[in-house]
Amino acid sequence: MNLLHALILGALQGVTEVLPISSSAHLILVPWLLGWPESGLTFDVALHLGTFLALVVYFRRDIVDMAVSTIDAVKHRSLDTPARRLPFLVIASAVPAALVGKLFETQIEELFRSRPLLIGLFLILFGVGLGLADLFGRKRRFMAQVTVSHALVIGLFQCLALIPGVSRSGITITAGLMLGFNRVGAARFSFLMSLPIVAGAALFKMLHLLDQGIPAGEGLPLAAGIVSSAVTGYISVAFLLRFVQKRSIAPFVWYRLIAGGAVVSVILTGISG
């Protein structure tokens, strides 16, 4: 992984991990289309660390509030307020994806990484699902109204994000909209519930990398990838949360349809060969 590739793919990760357009699809399809070599474990660590840093910095006040609320809930042995419930709802929503990811992430990645046609189709299919949820969802509920059942349902949907082309933020926002939450509530809970998942993935891959050792010459690309994905990730979170306050998610749906259609067309017409 050279420095330029690390910067470009780091920025691509930061943007596409946050926006509902699938980071895994872009990180597979872009190198495939450009003929770049596959990124290894070192760069996977950079991407996850960068994304985690972006989320932690942006949601730092929420994280502190949840920590205080957790202590308060334990102290009073009560979950009688939305603030006291939120940390436990975030944890509950992360459980399904954590279990499925631990058991099947490697198999799913190997199954779809070499099948760009399926990735293109999933971009289209789940883009349509996002569009329908945004169009027909009632949007009457706020994030403070999330219940345990809501958190578990959204968490189950998050399991699908292991499939390239689905999008973690996209599928969880879709689930939130289907459950009647407004766009801001669905998006904000989507990001908060991603914190333990992204943290766990970053820690797991980092431990694996430390066990293997950082390959010679990859220290600088590793740092560049972390910074690039962190900066663009932070900007993308801020942008999306402002965007959904006043606008629909339709532009992201159209992007998914066009990008997925382009990938499918390239493959079926043999242009990539």
Swiss-Prot record:
UniProt-listed GO biological process terms: cell wall organization; peptidoglycan biosynthetic process; regulation of cell shape; response to antibiotic
One GO molecular-function entry: undecaprenyl-diphosphatase activity
Reactions this protein catalyses: di-trans,octa-cis-undecaprenyl diphosphate + H2O = di-trans,octa-cis-undecaprenyl phosphate + phosphate + H(+)
Segments traversing the membrane: 39-59, 86-106, 117-137, 146-166, 189-209, 220-240, 249-269
Its EC number(s): 3.6.1.27
InterPro entries: UppP
Statement: the UniProt record of this protein carries the keyword Hydrolase: yes
Cellular component GO terms held in the UniProt record: plasma membrane
Protein's cellular compartments: Cell inner membrane
Alphabetical keyword list: Antibiotic resistance, Cell inner membrane, Cell membrane, Cell shape, Cell wall biogenesis/degradation, Hydrolase, Membrane, Peptidoglycan synthesis, Transmembrane, Transmembrane helix
Pfam families: BacA
Membrane topology, from the record: Multi-pass membrane protein
NCBIfam families: undec_PP_bacA
UniProt miscellaneous comment: Bacitracin is thought to be involved in the inhibition of peptidoglycan synthesis by sequestering undecaprenyl diphosphate, thereby reducing the pool of lipid carrier available.
Family: Belongs to the UppP family.
Physiological role: Catalyzes the dephosphorylation of undecaprenyl diphosphate (UPP). Confers resistance to bacitracin.
Name of the protein: Undecaprenyl-diphosphatase
Originating organism: Pelobacter propionicus (strain DSM 2379 / NBRC 103807 / OttBd1)
